[in-house]
Swiss-Prot record:
Name of the protein: Single-stranded DNA-binding protein 2
Swiss-Prot/TrEMBL keywords: Acetylation, DNA-binding, Nucleus, Phosphoprotein
GO CC annotation terms, alphabetical: cytoplasm; nucleus
Species: Homo sapiens
Record PROSITE patterns: LISH (PS50896)
Pro residues bias locations: 246-256
Gene designation per UniProt: SSBP2
The keyword Zinc-finger belongs to this UniProt entry's keyword annotation: no
Residue numbers bearing the Phosphoserine modification: 321
Chief localization: nucleus
Domain LisH: 18-50
Length: 361
């Protein structure tokens, strides 16, 4: 039926081969519909001199046209006015459902897009091997992406995921990662060493303060009842975005554990690493103490913020400016001294653990 060129059927046909096949199919169609004189006239006019092998009726051209016409009539814009088969309608419906959606169209609610510069190779090319034009898998953004915005997730999960535990030589136990809570922007400084300081405004975008909270080794996580979220806001780019602590491994969050309940500001924030302060106090990460992740700040009530910890401790967090951070519904009085400006807390200096303290939001 294919005549010349059948041996090259596996190769891409050339234009001349395509014209020859079309001429054969037209001749075959004319013969099958009973137009023998027209078929012979057609061959003589195109000066066909090769042997012809006919296929079974109704022939390829007729069969191909019927399939095309059925699919053409079953298109969504014509299916109401043209007759079509259920198979053709199902084909169009499947093709519409399997059409590739725009990028970010299938992002799960718990994953977010990065804010600020995206590292090279962040968006890896992906395509379904079986259906190249079919549905693409959802684009998964790692929770440790730079400035990732998490979705609706609990602040402190009651159980840790054993499959995500990682050990570190500088920590007493395996470093257990937690899913970041709502409203918090996790920082993933895996591109920077423990002693390196990433540039400001490189980990967060405008209005997106960064704060990486997670456990170190030691005691298990507390499970506060009313610890829903820690809301805070920033109207200036890059505020409260800082690199990992001086001694912590990359990606280790820094949440302090208060030493005691005195009014001295030296009890909770001691042994600060020497990092030059910046304007508007741009660098304020918090990290775990050696006694347990988020040991004491796992839930501070309002009176702990203003009363027992004193103005020298947590009151300096709340500033009288749009670049403030609120860890409680009752922030302390603002103050302007540079006691904590731009410095990083040593994640291994806090020594007390208060499991009875709960966070009030």
């Amino acid at each position: 039926m294919y005549g010349k060129g059948k041996s090259n059927s596996s190769a891409v046909p050339s234009d001349s081969q395509a014209r020859e096949k079309l001429a054969l199919y037209v001749y075959e169609y004319l013969l099958h519909v009973g137009a023998q004189k027209s078929a012979q006239t057609f061959l003589s006019e195109i000066r066909w001199e090769k042997n012809i092998t006919l296929g079974e009726p109704p022939g390829f051209l007729h069969s191909w046209w019927c399939v095309f016409w059925d699919l053409y009539c079953a298109a969504p814009e014509r299916r109401e006015t043209c007759e079509h088969s259920s198979e053709a309608k199902a084909f169009h419906d499947y093709s519409a459902a399997a059409a590739p959606s725009p990028v970010l169209g299938n992002i799960p609610p718990g994953d977010g897009m990065p804010v600020g510069p995206v590292p090279p190779g962040f968006f890896q090319p992906f395509m379904s091997p079986r259906y190249p034009g079919g549905p693409r898998p959802p684009l998964r953004i790692p929770n440790q992406a730079l400035g990732g915005v998490p979705g609706s997730q609990p602040l402190l999960p009651s159980g840790m995921d054993p499959t995500r535990q990682q050990g570190h030589p500088n920590m007493g136990g395996p470093m257990q990662r937690m899913t970041p809570p709502r409203g918090m922007v996790p920082l993933g400084p895996q591109n920077y060493g423990g002693a390196m300081r990433p540039p400001l405004n490189a980990l967060g975008g405008p209005g997106m303060p960064g704060m990486n909270m997670g456990p170190g080794g030691g005691r298990p996580w507390p499970n506060p009842t009313n610890a829903n979220s820690i809301p805070y806001s920033s109207a200036s780019p890059g505020n409260y975005v800082g690199p990992p602590g001086g001694g912590g491994p990359p990606g280790t969050p820094i949440m302090p554990s208060p030493a005691d309940s005195t009014n001295s500001g030296d009890n909770m924030y001691t042994l600060m690493n020497a990092v030059p302060p910046g304007p508007n106090r741009p660098n304020f990460p918090m990290g775990p103490g050696s006694d347990g992740p988020m040991g004491g700040l796992g839930g501070m009530e309002s009176h702990h913020m203003n009363g027992s910890l004193g103005s020298g401790d947590m009151d300096s967090i709340s500033k009288n400016s749009p670049n403030n951070m609120s860890l409680s519904n009752q922030p302390g009085t603002p103050r302007d001294d540079g006691e904590m400006g731009g410095n990083f807390l040593n994640p291994f200096q806090s020594e007390s653990y208060s499991p009875s303290m709960t966070m009030s939001v």
